[in-house]
Structure formats: C-alpha cells, structure tokens
Amino acid sequence: VKLALVYASSLCFFAFFILIQFNVLTIILGIASMFLAFAYPFMKRITYWPQLFLGLTFNWGIVMAWTAMTNSVSLEVIVLYTAAIFWTLGYDTIYGVQDIEDDEIIGIKSTSIKFKKNIKFFVSVCYFLSIVILIGLFQDQFGLNNFTILVTIFILSLIYQIIKFNKSNSKKCLQAFKINNFSGFI
C-alpha cells in the first residue's frame, strides 16, 4: 500500500507539473477532474451507473483539450463530450458483461447487471444517441460532407459491435469491446 501511495503521488506530481503549463481555465478543469478520477472506483459500490460516471470521467479530457486550445467552454464541446459519454456508457457496458456473475457475487453494481435482460437494446440506444449527437454536431459545425467518411466508418464500427456482441459469450463480448480501439481512432 505504501509503495502504491508513493507511485500515485509521483504520478499526481508529474500530472500537476504538466497541467500548470496550460491556461487558468484548463488548470481549473484539471483540478476538478481529480474529484471524478478519485470517486470513480467507488461508484460500483454506490450505483448501477458506474459506466456513466466513467464516461463523465474518461471523456473530461475532451473539454480540457478544447479549453487548452480556445480558453473557453462552448456548446460544441459539451455536445461532443455528451456523445462520447454515451459511447463510453455503451462500450463499458459490453465490457462489464464478462464480469456479471462475479460482480453479483461480491455485490458490485453496473449497467451490465441493471440491463442484463436487455443489454443489447441498452447498448444500441447508447450508441444510437452517440451517433445522432455526433451527426448533429458535425452537420451543424462543419457540414456533414467534410466528415461523411469518418462518421460512416464510426457508425459502422458501432453497428458491427452490436452484431458481434453476444452476452452469453465472453469472447464475443471482449472482441466487441476491443473494436472500440478502432472506433476511438476514427
């Protein structure tokens, strides 16, 4: 435990050193992100929605990158952040399917457990919302034509995950989850 605390403290020190290179707004957001990062591990004990909290936490970097570049927060970045949250909610629910039995035994909560009878539908809704939000954002901001190929590939990767995903087969769940490396790259 002592070594882990030293390691975590070292990482926090280096992260803070990097953070102070940015503008004041980004620094404030970076410090605020610490609440999310430290609270996330406890969410599985508190709520069936830790994947939503992961989405809020993991995608906070989108807002920070925007503020680092523009020194402002705008509707566009909040919309992109929201789309990424739904995407994370979907893919982490797929990942969590592999752990349902063990999580139920030890009393850990997740969206995978909450929606286990309708998991494919829940993930589909999450991905659908992410796609609709992204299409709306890109069409409004850039004109859909500029991003048609990338958005189409992203959409197809999410649809492929839904097709590949089988809650009764851990290997298929992991394969579907790993597709998100490609989806995120897009």
Residue ranges and their predicted role:
Residues L75-W87, G143-L150:
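Alpha-helical transmembrane segments
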Residues V1-G30, F86, I105-F147:
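Multi-pass membrane catalytic core of lipid/isoprenoid biosynthesis enzymes
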Residues A15-L19, G55-M64, L80-W87, S130-L134, ...:
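Juxtamembrane/interfacial segments around transmembrane helices
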Residues K2-V79, G136, S157-K167:
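Intramembrane alpha-helical segments
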Residues V132, G136-I186:
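Extended hydrophobic alpha-helices typical of membrane-associated regions
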